[in-house]
């Protein structure tokens, strides 16, 4: 997968727009959000996308994101926080409550490094965002070699990141996949970041300018995934 659209269930998107996203050339979708996420909205969005053969990932930020029928679950593990709630605390609580029923083969953990200090998710998770390039590379190595996480996700959350940081962090990984998200608003930015990232995630621009969002995916339309 080279390109994923990230959809917020708390935001409305017409069915016609969803159809355009499905046929844009993207490789799949992430359903996830930080604020005002209701299970009914998650269910509706998942069902609207249900007819596509593209993979649909549910990113579990809280219990309202859990749909038992979903094919793929993403579990964020925030690496650059000192609040253990976001590294393993909430995870342990959920496993304690539902562990016997969790479809582990459909669950993938993703090591997050959040780098936009003004983002809601940074405030929520108490992320330490004033990191050097060396700090971020070290987190990449931590994700792969200590925690053995399958995904290392650098999240600039609405702000376009530094391609050089992405290049350095990606180069530090051998087996863990590098995902990049944040501020991609043009096909040129998509092409720039995908030179280094295994997968780019495009989100906010969907709700700001759909046509520009579609352009970020069309460059992948003829490529083999």
Swiss-Prot record:
Sequence positions that bind sn-glycerol 1-phosphate: 6, 153-158, 183, 203-204
Pfam families in the cross-refs: PcrB
Cofactor: Mg(2+)
Known pathway: Membrane lipid metabolism; glycerophospholipid metabolism
Keywords: Lipid biosynthesis, Lipid metabolism, Magnesium, Metal-binding, Phospholipid biosynthesis, Phospholipid metabolism, Transferase
Binding site for Mg(2+): 8, 34
EC number assigned by the record: 2.5.1.n9
Biological process per Gene Ontology, one example term: glycerophospholipid biosynthetic process
Database matches in InterPro entries: GGGP/HepGP_synthase_I, GGGP/HepGP_synthase_sf, GGGP_HepGP_synthase
Catalytic activity: sn-glycerol 1-phosphate + all-trans-heptaprenyl diphosphate = 3-heptaprenyl-sn-glycero-1-phosphate + diphosphate
Leading EC class: transferase
Disulfides per UniProt: none
GO molecular function: heptaprenylglyceryl phosphate synthase activity; magnesium ion binding
Functional summary from the UniProt entry: Prenyltransferase that catalyzes in vivo the transfer of the heptaprenyl moiety of heptaprenyl pyrophosphate (HepPP; 35 carbon atoms) to the C3 hydroxyl of sn-glycerol-1-phosphate (G1P), producing heptaprenylglyceryl phosphate (HepGP). This reaction is an ether-bond-formation step in the biosynthesis of archaea-type G1P-based membrane lipids found in Bacillales.
Protein family according to the UniProt entry: Belongs to the GGGP/HepGP synthase family. Group I subfamily.
Complex and partners: Homodimer.
NCBIfam families: GGGP-family, PRK04169.1-3
Name listed for the protein in its UniProt record: Heptaprenylglyceryl phosphate synthase
Gene it is expressed from: pcrB
